[in-house]
Amino acid sequence: MFLFRVFRSSRTAIILLLCFLVSPCLQAQSPSHYEPSLESLDKHPLPQWYADAKLGIFIHWGLYSVPGWAPLIHPEHDFTSPDYITHNPYAEWYLNSMRLEGAPTKAYHREHYGADYDYYNFAPVFNREIQKWNPDTWAKIFHDAGAKYVVLTTKHHDGFTLWPSLTPNPKLAAERQHATRDLVGELTAAVGKQGLRMGLYYSGGYDWTFVPGPIRVPADYEAVKPQSEAYGKYADAHMRELIERYHPAVLWNDIDYPKSGHPLQIMAEYYNTVPDGVIDDRFGVKHSDFISPEYVTLDKISPTKWEECRGLGRSFGYNRAEGEAETIAPADLIYLLVDIVSKNGNLLLDVGPEADGTIPPVQMDRLLALGAWLQMNGDAIYGTRPWKRAAGETAEGIPVRFTEKDSAVYATLLGQPKTTGITLKSLSLKVGSQIYLLGQATPLSWSQQGDAIKVSLPATLPGRYANVLKVIGPLS
């Protein structure tokens, strides 16, 4: 993944500004044909499936999964830190990190593989390991976790592709260019059988086989973007292959797109091939269907659809150094999803498999917890829209997040009540309205007390992490 370029102090303000600049017209009818112009592309409406989905699974898998290591120095992704690049916690940046003097990854590589061991020697190892992989197993796991779509890295910054591309890489030996199995095609088929949609990530802005770098300082982020005519044609050809062969529901580019390429043409061809597809905001042009903050949650409801991408841990790619302490806790993961959805967002939650496709046990634990919670409480998530405000609080100090769907408002408690009653502050409800607890069929007793609603709860609550009140009636 890209190191998100907006410093933490100003990220949210810039992201919210982008909401207005890139907002697609949600009421517009889909044109029968798109042209490679912003005027035409901006007529693309946000598909209802994407607005309803709320949860996707991101997968970072490639040569970097073989060493599968990054340092754990920066727990909060402090991109402004002077040593962030040399101590990059993203394991998928292994190739860059192993070439930096003073980088822990360089020392790790020297110790485990030798100083002269070429990164692309991992290709035959990866291709041997992927023979153990079962795409149907992944698809079932993602379905049971509650995801509605999946996004796979088809080519990351190292240039290695997860499909047998018909466009050869002039910088790499044939046996080191791509996976020997069509991982993209196989997972697309498996995901479809589970009723999920398949999206594809492509690193258009970086390809370290064309411009190796390395990236040592922030100024290098732009300098290492390949802009040659040859690379523009190469990226365009890859994009066309992915669109024509796999019809991805999400076209997820990263790090901008080469100026020598034709992003507007690619977008038009994509919409004409997949009319209900969506495009992210990382092509470097002023069109997208959603914005994509990385490890950042917006502070308020956004008028534009947005999708937070983040790993279950600090890395997107597999990092064998990560464990419980570096992995988001089940409760925090559920609270994060609820918070994002209340503000008109989706969560694109990343898993980092080992080279053979094994999902680390600590990540499996989180997926199972999330899936179990969604099985009971999914009505408050899927197909909902933000209510008139995202956040509230009980008189007892429990944070609340609101969503709505049809005639119901859902109030999700981000914490466990310590008594058999809670008071929802600054809310009023008309007599005759009903309040239910998701997971139970009997309505709850409630009363209006001034500008607050007091709700009686059962002694035993059905939810382990976050319980949801379903309010049927005019809530204000």
Regions found by a protein language model. Name each.
Residues 1-9:
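N-terminal secretory signal peptides that target proteins for export/translocation
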Residues 29-476:
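Mature catalytic domains of secreted/periplasmic carbohydrate-active enzymes
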Residues 12-13, 297:
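Intrinsically disordered, low-complexity peptide-like regions
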Residues 8-9, 24, 407:
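Generic signature of intrinsically disordered, low-complexity, basic-rich segments
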Residues 6, 15-16, 49:
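Generic alpha-helix initiation/capping and coil-helix boundary signal
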Residues 13-24:
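Bacterial N-terminal signal peptides
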